[in-house]
Amino acid sequence: MNKDNTPFDRSALASYFLEFLVIGHRGAAGLAPENTLPSFRKALDMGCQGVELDVHAVNDASGEQQLVVIHDDTVDRTTNGRGPVSLHTIEQIAELDAGDGNRIPRLAEVTALAAGYIADTQPLINIELKGKGTAAPTARFLRTHPGLAVLVSSFNHEELAAFRETDKTTPVAPLFERARGNMLETATQLGASCINMSTRMAKPSLIEQCREAGMPVLVYTVNQLHETQRLKAMGVAGVFTDRPDNLIPVIAR
């Protein structure tokens, strides 16, 4: 954590862009069950400067909202359970097997893991707002966990705007899978610190346009070294990867 617990803001994030970033996608999703503590630990142990995760909000037995780390709207694909995430309580979520005997972690467990790493720079945590209504509980969580190095992103730009209304400081990034409106205008309206986009969108002309506007670009999901090197030469700020083992040994040289 930041030694003085100062808020992590746009200027703090900018220091991460001084080097090319390799961010573990759902941890190291190609090497361990996605969005589990062993997956995040593996990504950080391999040298990723950060990890990306997805959050949904569920209720506990008292009706309080809790943030859990899972990608899909249902638990079907990644666990031994069935049904929408939102219809499970935190207690029911804790009973599910998310692969190799691992549980679906709470957000607090992942941030504690990342904050506990001894490194020159604490790992960046990219929290993607996945479920509807995740903006408010995520903002509350960050208020009670100061000093974390966090970037908040979402494909749901309305949810991201709701987060920005509540939290004016934490860096945000709109996510784009395909061209949709004016990306730079959207980013500016959100007060974004960077743009996260798919590999198919990452064309030289668009990357240059973003760079000229002072908007760093992070690209997902990149698992091959040659593609990473191509994007790095193009000027992107970093990539999200399921396979840090393919990238870190060369990129980190």
Regions found by a protein language model. Give the residues of each.
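Phosphate-group recognition and catalysis centered on beta-loop-alpha active-site segments
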Residues: 1-253
